């Protein structure tokens, strides 16, 4: 499933009615916005971004060597760094003193190593890389679409390039270079950033709400240049009344059957956070942020 984009309010309304998706989100909010002007070449820009953010590293000779096939240990280290993982659990496959042991213990506790044959020196294929991505991102976007291989699902989602022309689109055995990995990891870093920012604004909005004399009163957060925020009220005849960044409202509850909070990336309309309010009097909210698959 490709990432859904906000095109029409009516399309959003349909998506929100699918049902709640509840998942834990880290409370940490990244400090730096995504405003750096990088090279137009995706690989070069992604490498620069990875080095700047500190989730990929150069070799001892001072070179990045983007042409080299990435190892399991390198990719797992990047995932652990992006997730900001601190706690671990035993990984008996690695001996005491092994350079990757502490990192793998953190990855193990977070579920990143589920169904993974532990071998830090292993050169990764697309399928092996995609499995690690989906394991690492389960707290944010749920499980992959069961109708695809890991490779097929990640290509369809838009985080991995398809095979070159003339080959099966979802070919699983192709190698993943360090430059390829940098592109994937930047998308993950950015996705985590926007999800956490969306959660921050969703909570700010929720705390602004109050019910007074049959009216729902609240204020849409001002947001920032990256996140566009919309609050939509749905009337009983399915019309939509909307409010945007920084706007306040006082709406008569009996005129509406539900309300949605929608936070999207203003650059590509990808969905950062969605909450559905079905009972406006009680202010109960259910998370409906887009998942890798709506069917688990």
Which stretches of residues belong to each language-model region?
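N-terminal propeptides
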Residues: 19-215
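Short, aromatic- and glycine-rich surface loops/edge beta-strands on solvent-exposed regions
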Residues: 257-295
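Solvent-exposed strand-loop boundary residues in beta-sheet-rich modules
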Residues: 235-237, 267
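Beta-strand signatures of extracellular beta-sandwich domains
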Residues: 230-232
């Amino acid at each position: 499933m490709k990432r859904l984009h906000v095109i029409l309010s009516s399309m959003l309304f349909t998506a929100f009615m699918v049902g709640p998706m509840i998942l834990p989100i880290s409370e940490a909010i990244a400090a730096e916005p995504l405003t750096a002007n990088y090279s137009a070449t995706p690989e070069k820009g992604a490498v620069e971004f990875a080095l700047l953010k500190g989730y990929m590293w150069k070799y001892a000779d001072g070179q990045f060597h983007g042409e080299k096939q990435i190892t399991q240990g390198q990719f797992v280290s990047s995932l652990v760094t992006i997730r900001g993982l601190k706690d671990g659990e035993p990984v008996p496959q690695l001996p005491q003193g092994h350079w990757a042991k502490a990192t793998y213990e953190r990855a193990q506790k977070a579920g990143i190593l589920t169904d993974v044959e532990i071998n830090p020196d292993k050169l990764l294929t697309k399928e092996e890389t995609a499995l690690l991505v989906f394991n690492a991102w389960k707290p944010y976007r749920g499980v992959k679409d069961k109708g695809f291989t890991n490779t097929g699902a990640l290509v369809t989602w838009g985080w991995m390039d398809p095979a070159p022309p003339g080959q099966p689109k979802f070919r699983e055995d192709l190698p993943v270079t360090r430059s390829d990995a940098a592109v994937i990891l930047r998308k993950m870093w950015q996705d985590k950033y926007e999800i956490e920012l969306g959660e921050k604004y969703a909570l700010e909005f929720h705390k602004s709400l109050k019910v007074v004399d049959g009216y729902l009163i609240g204020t849409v957060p001002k947001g920032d240049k990256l996140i566009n925020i919309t609050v939509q009220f749905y009337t009983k005849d399915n019309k939509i009344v909307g409010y945007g960044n920084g706007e306040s409202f006082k709406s008569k509850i009996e005129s509406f059957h539900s309300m949605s909070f929608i936070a999207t990336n203003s650059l590509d309309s990808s969905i950062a956070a969605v909450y559905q309010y079905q009972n406006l009097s009680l202010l109960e909210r259910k998370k409906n942020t887009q998942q890798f698959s709506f069917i688990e």
